[in-house]
C-alpha cells in the first residue's frame, strides 16, 4: 500500500482588524507642539529639516526610527538620523530630486506632470512616491480624485510602495480601501469614493500584510483627532492593542 504523506502545517493566522492600523499614521510637525499621542496607530513623526537643525536638543525632536525629515533646507554632513527623508518638488525638478543620495530612504512628492510617468520614474529610481488624498471631493476629470486613483492603481505594481498625505479619518479609510482595490485589480476610483469598511475588517492576514507593504504610512496634521474619529467610525479598530509596526521604508 502506498504511503500517504503526512503534511504538517502551523496554525492558520488569526484575523486581527487592528493590524491594518498599527503604526500606520505619521504625525505631521504641526502636532509636535503638543505631545504626539502615545498610540499604536502612530508609527512616527514628520518634521521639517530646518526644525531638526534648529531644535536638535528638543525632546520632541530626538532622533528616532520613526522620524520622517522633510527637506526644506540643505542638510549638513552628517545628515540627521531619520527613518526616511521627504522632498516636495515640481515636475521640472523631479530628476534632480531622484538623483539625491541620502543615508535613509527618500519619499518624493512631485506636483504636476503625468501621474503615471512620475510614479514610474520615482519607483525606477528606488524611491517612494506620494499620493495626496486630501482633495478627493475634486471629482472633475483629471482632478485630484483621478490623480490619486491613478497613483494608487500603480502602487501594487511598483517595487517600493507609496506614502499617503491625508487630513481626516475618512481620507485614511479611503487610502486603505484604494490600496486594497489596487492589489485586487478592482476599481480604485470607486474604492476611494465609497470605501467598504466591512471588507477591510474581513481582510485575511496575508492581505493585511500585502496592503501595509504597499502603504508605507499616512501623514496627518492632527493625529489625535484622526485617531478619535477612526475609533468612532470603526469600533473594531478601537481596541488597538499594544504592538507597533509599519510599512518598510528601505
Name each model-derived stretch.
Residues 1-250:
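Expand to "…catalyze enediolate/carbanion chemistry for C-C bond making/breaking, isomerization
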